[in-house]
C-alpha cells in the first residue's frame, strides 16, 4: 500500500489532537510512499500535522504535530496537542520510516 503516493480521507479517533482535531473529524492526507519517506522529511515544517506509526503500535496510525526535525539522524519529534497524548515525550525521536503521510486539510 505504501509503494506510491496517494491521497485519502481518515477519521480522527481519540483526543490526542484535541481541541484542534477532535475525535470524529475527517482529514485529507497525502500518503508518502516508503521509497519517498526520506525525501519527505526535509520538506516537513514545524507544527505541521502528520500521520505516523508509533514504535509501540506499528500497525496503528496516529495523528501528531511535528515539533522538531533532526535531518542528520533522519528523525522527527512529534507531539499531540493534548498534553495527555502519548507521543515523542514518551517515545523520543521517531525514525522517518514511521512517517505515513501529511495532513493536507484541515491544516490547523
Where are these regions (language model features)?
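Extended hydrophobic leader/signal-anchor segments used for secretion and membrane insertion
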Residues: 1-108
Amino acid at each position: 500500500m505504501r509503494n506510491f503516493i496517494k491521497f485519502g480521507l481518515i477519521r480522527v479517533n481519540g483526543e490526542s489532537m484535541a481541541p484542534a482535531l477532535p475525535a470524529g473529524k475527517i482529514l485529507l492526507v497525502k500518503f508518502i510512499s516508503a521509497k519517498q519517506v526520506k525525501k519527505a522529511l526535509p520538506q516537513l515544517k514545524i507544527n505541521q500535522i502528520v500521520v505516523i506509526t508509533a514504535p509501540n503500535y506499528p500497525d496503528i496510525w496516529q495523528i501528531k504535530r511535528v515539533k522538531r526535525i533532526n535531518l542528520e539522524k533522519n528523525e522527527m519529534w512529534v507531539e499531540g496537542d493534548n498534553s495527555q497524548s502519548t507521543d515523542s515525550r514518551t517515545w523520543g525521536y521517531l525514525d522517518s520510516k514511521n512517517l505515513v503521510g501529511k495532513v493536507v486539510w484541515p491544516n490547523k
